[in-house]
Amino acid sequence: MNTFSQVWVFSDTPSRLPELMNGAQALANQINTFVLNDADGAQAIQLGANHVWKLSGKPDERMIEDYAGVMADTIRQHGADGLVLLPNTRRGKLLAAKLGYRLKAAVSNDASTVSVQDGKATVKHMVYGGLAIGEERIATPYAVLTISSGTFDAAQPDASRTGETHTVEWLAPAVAITRTATQARQSNSVDLDKARLVVSVGRGIGSKENIALAEQLCKAIGAELACSRPVAENEKWMEHERYVGISNLMLKPELYLAVGISGQIQHMVGANASQTIFAINKDKNAPIFQYADYGIVGDAVKILPALTAALAR
C-alpha cells in the first residue's frame, strides 16, 4: 500500500496550504483539512479537500496550537492511523509537537521528501546543518510531519470540487499559554516563495545603507529582496522572514542573484533549487561560485549601480 487511507492537513499560513494539499493528494485517498474560517474552508475544498473541519471558538488570547487537543480527538475518532501534514513554521512545529504527544505519533520536522511504503511514511530531510540527507521510516500508526516550503508544487484550485464541512468546537486545554498583549511589527515582508526573481544580499554588501543599491536593482528588474541569515540574525539589517537557508526559506526562483554572499552550505540549501544562480562577490574563492551558473568577481557596491543602469534600459 503506497498511500494512507486518509491525511489531515492544517496551515497557519494560508499561502502554504496549496502545496500541502498537493502533497496530500499524492499521499492519501481521503483529505481532511482543518481551517480557521469559512474562506479558508472554501479554498481547501477547491484545492481537493474531501472534508473540511472548521476550528471554532478559540478566545483571542489563546494560541492556535491550543487547538491540538480537539484536533487530536477528531483525528482519532475517524481512524486508527493516518498522516498529519503541517507547514514548518514556528506555529506549525509547536502544533506538531502537541499533536505528536496526543496521538502517540512520531514527529519529523522540515521534511523535503515524503513517500509511503507498506502503509508507513518515509521522510527525508536535511541533517548536520545541511551537510547530509537523513531518511526516517515512521513506524507509529499516526505520523506528524512539518513540510519544508517547496517540497510539493502548489495545487491548483478547481471551483467545481465539492466537499463536506464540519465544525470542531474549542475545548480549553488544562495547561496553556495565554497571550497578554500584542505589538504590531513593522515589516515589508512579501511571499518570497512565489517570487520569480530574487536578489539576495549578504554581509559582503558592507552596510545596511548599501542594501538600497540592491533594492534599486529589484525595482529595475521586478525582483524581490532576500538576504542571508547573518544579515537578518546577526546584523539586524533586514527582517527575519527574508533570510534564505536551511532553517528558514527554501526558494526555487527562476533567478537567484546572490550579492556579497559567501555561499556556505546552510545558505545554499535554501537557494540551490533555483533555475539560475548569479553571484557577485569580491572573493574569487568564495564557495558561492561553486554553485553559480554566472558570476562576477568584484565589489558589489560598484557593480550593482552599473548593473541596475544596464538592466533598466
From Swiss-Prot:
Which positions bind FAD?
Answer: 255-283
Q: Which UniProt keywords apply?
A: Electron transport, FAD, Flavoprotein, Transport
GO process annotations (BP): carnitine metabolic process; fatty acid beta-oxidation using acyl-CoA dehydrogenase
Q: Name one GO molecular function term.
A: flavin adenine dinucleotide binding
* Disulphide-bonded residues: none
Query: InterPro entries recorded for this chain?
Result: DHS-like_NAD/FAD-binding_dom, ETF_a/b_N, ETF_a/FixB, ETF_asu_C, ETF_asu_C_CS, FixB, Rossmann-like_a/b/a_fold
The metabolic or biological pathway listed in the UniProt record of this protein is:
Amine and polyamine metabolism; carnitine metabolism
Summarizing the function annotation, the protein's role is: Required for anaerobic carnitine reduction. May bring reductant to CaiA.
Query: What family, per the record?
Result: Belongs to the ETF alpha-subunit/FixB family.
Report the HAMAP family cross-referenced here: FixB (MF_01056)
Stored NCBIfam families: PRK03363.1
Complexes and interactors: Heterodimer of FixA and FixB.
What is the protein's given name?
A: Protein FixB
| Lineage summary | Bacteria, Pseudomonadati, Pseudomonadota, Gammaproteobacteria, Enterobacterales
